A protein has these predicted regions:
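ATP-binding N-terminal substructure of ATP-dependent carboxylate-amine bond-forming enzymes
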Residues: 1-176, 187-202, 449, 453-550
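Short beta-strand-to-turn element immediately C-terminal to the catalytic PLP-Schiff-base lysine
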Residues: 187, 228-234, 336-339, 410, ...
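Active-site "cap" helix and flanking loop/linker of ATP-utilizing ligase/carboxylase catalytic domains
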Residues: 350-403, 431-475
Length: 550
């Protein structure tokens, strides 16, 4: 029986493209190969689609393969990348010849795979699994395109996605329904840019009075804690810096820049021009456009010798900033999934233990910078309250299939929910798989659940949803056959742990091997934990949720 062709959409033009790329790779690895044929569809910086050659799926980051070093045109090889000294890297939008020409974009994509139109995608896949993040990925844009072409897709629909990307709209809806919301206000970019110092000082006083001198500043349309600042008893300069950062603006001061040595300046430029830690490229410096890190470095070197500051402004900026009260309490994240009938069920919430005040991009995606404790360590009755609250909010926003809802619970049990997301990070250590393991689902099984419930949601909500019934029937037949063949799989023991100083590495490697084998057509992995010492040891069958503990 023919497998279901699942196009995995990952990458994209947003600031969260690297999170998407890593998550898409996880889906590609872990999707059940008995049922599905995974098709990696890379979305580039300009929104073009590309059937990605499999070897590039395993690159560490997008910039490691795209844009490529060379392109081949009419039998000739020509250089694609400009001179990039000091180990600088750029995304494709920093190369003007590519950014300004559709033909060049296609030439570049030909080096890493096969460019596809949406019409070609329509004929190549049966279902779209969306691992995209941020703008154009979880804001209703790609969902609308797929609806137009009648391609069923994973997750929430257009309206819920559009609401899920806008933190200010979320807060407004929560306030209207009195749903677990803290105090907040908003500030438009146009108002901030046109304000003089007196007006900015008035906002500074207003927000300090409103929020008791402890508040959070965040962009309204960004995820992964990009552009977020936590302010505690700030002075006016710190306040202005935080607001500017949320709008992806930054002042570089000569007094600080000129004190640094060459290595420190190069490091600063790398951080400034990285979408994950800074403004990204292209950007404006005092109104002048810069596409390359080296050109920006040269400009700052020359200009800051004669003037006190340079103002940097990202092309990929923000239109609105959210200012909200700081909440004291335990931070958590909760995945809510729908059952076959669309009814929400909240998985055991995870407590986030971080080294600093902010669960920032690095803490979220780099190992060792935060710990996840599942379920959160509070009174069991409060865990029930959290799960019920998350389900309530899920229904209020009209989410479908699954969502990730973050929040805080105070010392007296009051719950605040913020940043409801219509998608979740899908890397191996993410909340998405961490919490699924608590109810006995490995990544392969959980992805299958998301697929089936997404297909049912599209049947229910798409104007021509009945056309997807045959795909659902085919999928159900495939899974019935797969269950019948499961006893024929070769059982493979994956032994991890041990008693050496590297046992934590063994656990991580063992998890990765277990997860990849779980999606295999031929093998059934069995997780085994080894304990003891050099004189004696014991072997334990490791429960799935224990294997995913930090």
């Amino acid at each position: 029986m023919q497998k279901i062709r699942v196009g995995i959409f990952f990458g994209g033009p947003s600031r969260e493209r690297e999170v998407s790329f890593a998550g898409g790779r996880t889906v590609y690895d872990n999707i059940d190969k008995q049922l599905f044929e995974p098709i990696p569809i890379f979305v580039d910086s300009f929104g073009n689609f590309c059937l990605l050659n499999w070897e590039f799926v395993y690159k560490g980051s997008i910039r490691d393969f795209y844009p490529p070093t060379f392109v081949h045109v009419n039998g000739y090889r020509k250089s694609c990348l400009p001179d990039l000294p000091h180990g600088f890297q750029v995304y494709a939008e920093s190369i003007q010849s590519i950014a300004e020409s559709k033909d060049e974009q296609r030439n570049v994509l030909n080096e890493i795979g096969q460019p596809l139109t949406i019409e070609e995608i329509q004929s190549r896949i049966d279902f779209a699994f969306l691992a995209l993040h941020g703008t154009y990925g979880e804001d209703g844009s790609i969902q609308g395109l797929l609806e137009w072409y009648g391609i069923p897709y994973s997750g929430s629909g257009i309206l819920a996605s559009a609401m899920g990307i806008n933190k200010a709209i979320q807060k407004d809806f929560q306030t209207t329904a009195a749903l677990y919301v803290n105090d907040y206000t908003t500030l438009q970019q146009r108002d901030w840019l046109s304000a003089d110092t007196t007006e900015k000082q008035q906002w500074f006083v207003q927000f300090n009075v409103m929020f008791g001198e402890r508040f959070v500043v965040k962009p309204a349309h960004q995820g992964s804690s990009l552009g977020v600042s936590i302010l505690k008893h700030p002075n006016f300069d710190a306040f202005c810096t935080a607001i500017d950062l949320a709008f992806f603006r930054l002042h570089i001061h000569s007094s600080e820049w000129n004190e640094k040595n060459s290595e420190e300046k190069i490091k600063d430029i790398k951080q400034l021009t990285d979408l994950r830690s800074g403004l990204g490229l292209p950007l404006l410096a005092d109104g002048k456009e810069f596409y390359l890190p080296s050109d920006l470095l040269d400009y700052l070197e020359q200009t800051l010798k004669t003037q006190p500051t340079v103002l940097l402004q990202a092309h990929d900026s923000e239109s609105m900033v959210l200012i909200e009260s700081m909440i004291e309490g335990k931070e958590f994240s909760c995945i809510v999934v729908a059952d076959a009938d669309g009814n929400p069920f909240a998985l055991p919430p995870t407590e986030i233990r971080k080294s600093g005040d902010l669960f920032d991009y690095r803490s979220k995606y780099l190992p060792g910078l935060s710990n996840k404790v599942t379920p959160i360590e509070v009174d069991p009755a409060w865990i029930t309250d959290i799960r019920e609250a998350c389900c309530h909010l899920y229904l209020h926003f009209g989410f479908e299939v699954y969502a990730r809802i973050d929040g805080f619970i105070t010392d007296d049990g009051e719950i605040f929910l913020n940043d409801p997301n219509t998608t979740s990070g899908m890397m191996p250590s993410s909340f998405f798989f961490h919490q699924a393991a608590e109810i006995g689902l490995n990544p392969s099984a959980f992805l299958s659940l998301i697929y089936f419930n997404s297909l049912r949601a599209r049947i229910h909500s798409h104007p021509k949803g009945q056309l997807f019934h045959s795909l659902l029937l085919q999928s159900q037949n495939l899974i019935s056959n797969a269950h019948g063949q499961s006893t024929q799989k070769k059982k493979i023991a994956v032994i991890m742990g041990g008693y050496s100083f590297e046992r934590h590495i063994s656990m991580e490697s063992g998890r990765n091997i277990y997860e990849k084998l779980s999606s295999s057509e031929e093998m059934q992995p069995i997780p085994i934990f080894l304990a003891g010492d050099s004189s004696s040891y014991r072997l334990f069958l490791l429960p799935l949720n224990m294997m995913l503990k930090d």
